[in-house]
């Protein structure tokens, strides 16, 4: 399982530890990933995703998983999140416009 957020696509980054004497050694900055279960309003079911805590705050701020997935670019989404996005689009398309 890759260390990559399924919604934002954020992965490990590379940088340096810098000592007091300014000696630089390579290090990796890992994303703060959490396995969460989020309710999809359109599908009416729970979805389990591995996301960063920053992405989880975005889901709360934007008003739910559906809104975040519909606005997200397809390139950054994981295959599982992309499949959920397509299911949400199909479900919303079959509902009558009110």
From Swiss-Prot:
Keyword Ribonucleoprotein: yes
Pfam families (UniProt xref): Ribosomal_L28
Keyword hit for Transport: no
GO molecular function annotations of the record: structural constituent of ribosome
Domain of life: Bacteria
UniProt record, GO biological process: translation
Swiss-Prot/TrEMBL keywords: Ribonucleoprotein, Ribosomal protein
Family the entry assigns: Belongs to the bacterial ribosomal protein bL28 family.
NCBIfam families: L28
Full protein name: Large ribosomal subunit protein bL28
Gene that this sequence comes from: rpmB
């Amino acid at each position: 399982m890759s260390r990559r957020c399924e919604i934002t696509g954020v992965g490990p980054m590379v940088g340096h530890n810098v000592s007091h004497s300014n000696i630089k050694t390579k290090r990796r900055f890992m994303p703060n990933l959490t396995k969460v279960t989020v309710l999809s309003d359109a599908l009416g079911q729970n979805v389990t995703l591995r996301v960063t805590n920053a992405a989880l705050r975005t889901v709360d701020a934007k008003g739910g998983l559906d809104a975040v997935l519909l606005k997200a670019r397809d390139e950054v989404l994981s295959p599982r999140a992309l499949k959920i996005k397509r299911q949400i689009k199909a479900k919303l398309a079959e509902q009558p416009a009110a």
